[in-house]
Structure formats: C-alpha cells, structure tokens
C-alpha cells in the first residue's frame, strides 16, 4: 500500500498538499488537523487514519482518537501526536510502545521531519514534520512510502 503521512496541518489542506498526496492510496495524519473542516476535507480526498493533537478542538477529538494501533501491509503501526524519538520518547508514548510493540511508530508535534530506526526496540520511527504553515518551521514537509 502507498501511504501519505502528514501531521500538523493546522487548518491547511491546499492544492500543493493535494498534489503531493494524489498518488497515495491512504493518508495517515499524526494530529493537529487544526479544525473539523480540515479533517473532513482530507477524509473526503483519500481514506484516512488519524489521531488528534494537542491543538485540536473537541469536534476533531470526537472523530479521531488520541492514539491508534493498526496493521498495514503486515506491519503493526502505532500512531499518536506527541511521541518524541528513540532515547527521548514522551512518557505516555513510551508506555504505549512498550505495551503494543509496534513495527512502525508514527508521531507529529515537533514540526521536525524525522525518519529514525530505534535499534533497541526494532521500530521504525516516522515523524513527517509539519504540512501546514503555522509554527516555527520554514519548510512544509510530508512523507510518502510503500508498505
């Protein structure tokens, strides 16, 4: 399956992002949609798996959970918004990682694109950075990959 991974859209789902995501079969969103309208736009564009972020309001939180664990292409995936990275995981994310033992851990929040291997736990850690324009970052980022 061809996946488009985004996070931290903060209310922006524009033509540039649509063009980038056009070839994918499914979109994963690691939180901070920005509002319910943006979540609905993305879900209408492609099948969506998402979680809410710390900036999302109750309308978004009623539609997507704090974290999701699911299988894709034979891989166990864990997604939450605030996650950290190997050696510096958020405490709640670390508890979920230890409990679920995913093959792939997806998070957002930092607005920093990272693809890392947690060698200790044999987990691929993916943070797509920020696809929106709100925040300190100067470049919008997202990921596409095949499982």
Question: What is the role of each PLM region?
Answer:
Residues 1-48, 56-74, 79, 138-141:
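N-terminal active-site segment of His-dependent metallophosphoesterases
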Residues 6, 51, 81, 104-106, ...:
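Acidic/histidine-enriched, beta-strand-rich ligand/metal-binding domains
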Residues 11-15, 34-38, 55-60, 84-89, ...:
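Active-site environment of divalent metal-dependent phosphoester hydrolases
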Residues 21-23, 98-101:
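Glycine-rich phosphate-binding loop signature in dinucleotide/nucleotide-binding domains
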Residues 42-45, 97-100, 120:
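Short, conserved loop/helix-junction motifs that constitute active-site signature segments
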Residues 68, 114-117, 141-146:
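Short beta-strand scaffold segments in enzyme catalytic cores
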Residues 72-73, 100-101, 126-147:
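Binuclear metal-dependent phosphoesterase catalytic core
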Residues 92-99, 113:
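Non-DNA-binding regulatory cores of transcription-related proteins
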């Amino acid at each position: 399956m061809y996946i488009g991974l985004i996070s931290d859209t903060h209310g922006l789902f524009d033509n540039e992002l649509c063009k980038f995501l056009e070839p994918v079969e499914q979109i994963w969103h690691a939180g901070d949609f920005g509002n319910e309208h943006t979540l609905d736009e993305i879900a209408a564009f492609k099948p969506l798996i998402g979680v809410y972020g710390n900036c999302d309001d109750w309308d978004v939180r009623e539609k997507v959970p704090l974290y999701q664990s699911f299988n894709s292409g034979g891989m166990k995936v864990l997604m939450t918004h605030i996650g950290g990275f190997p050696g510096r995981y958020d405490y709640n994310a670390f508890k979920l990682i230890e409990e679920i033992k995913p093959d792939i851990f997806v998070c957002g929040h930092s607005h920093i694109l990272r693809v890392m291997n947690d060698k200790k736990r044999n987990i691929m850690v993916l943070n797509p950075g920020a696809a929106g324009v709100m925040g300190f970052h100067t470049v919008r980022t997202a990921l596409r990959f095949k499982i």
